Amino acid sequence: MRKVFPRPEILGRLYFCGFDVVSEQYIHDRYCVIAQKKRQPSQEQHRYGLLIRLRRIGKDGNKFNVFKFRTMYAYSEYLQTYVYENNDLDVGGKFNDDYRVTEWGHFLRKTWLDELPMFINMFKGQMKLVGVRPLSQQYYDLYTPELQQLRIKTKPGLLPPFYVDMPDTLEEIQESERKYLEAYLEHPFRTDWKYFWKIVGNILFKGKRSK
């Protein structure tokens, strides 16, 4: 019995197996990919059910598994660099035209339901309620070295300063996070208390959402 794989999973499986995609094209209504072997296959093991674990950078630079409801096709996490190089970033720091997200995933993200499992990380002491979002290695590498070091001084959070400042560009996102982190390191409780109520107010009463 033949199984049809969606495009993101095809590309993700190639990167998982150590290939880099050179080009994609349709030839006589057939989807074709040219790829080049670059490295050894990943040794990571995955279960692509409803609940997934994503490797993120936490306090002191330690990597941990963030729990989320799956919103993307299987193996999509291996396409971050490829999507960034070909699509760049959209307003708000998200990938432009991110075809890795499923139709159901768009709904989960719009309603924030995909992030509910991150309370598991908070209960495990890996995250806190307010703080900068835990980043993948690929996205973390886009930040300035100064902000990278500042970020790993604290635990990441569920409610980011993004919803206070609503920055558009990567530079503005970094400035928003820098402002929060510097304030937090000086006055931890006061800063998180102030940011929490600003975030809640902006989301509930001003309708602010990630773009």
Language-model features, listed with the residues they occupy:
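Short alpha-helix
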Residues: 1-18
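Aromatic-acidic/polar surface patches that form glycan- and anion
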Residues: 2-3, 93-100, 108-109, 186-189
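Conserved glycosyltransferase catalytic-site signature
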Residues: 7-8, 28-30, 101, 113
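A hydrophobic, helix-centered structural microdomain
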Residues: 16, 22-79, 189-211
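Hydrophobic structural segments characteristic of membrane proteins
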Residues: 43-44, 117-211
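Short, glycine-rich, amphipathic interfacial segments at transmembrane boundaries or analogous
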Residues: 54-99, 159-179
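Short, well-ordered beta-strand elements within core beta-sheets of diverse protein domains
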Residues: 55, 104-110, 182-184
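Short, conserved beta-strand/loop elements in beta-sheet-dominated catalytic cores
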Residues: 100-125
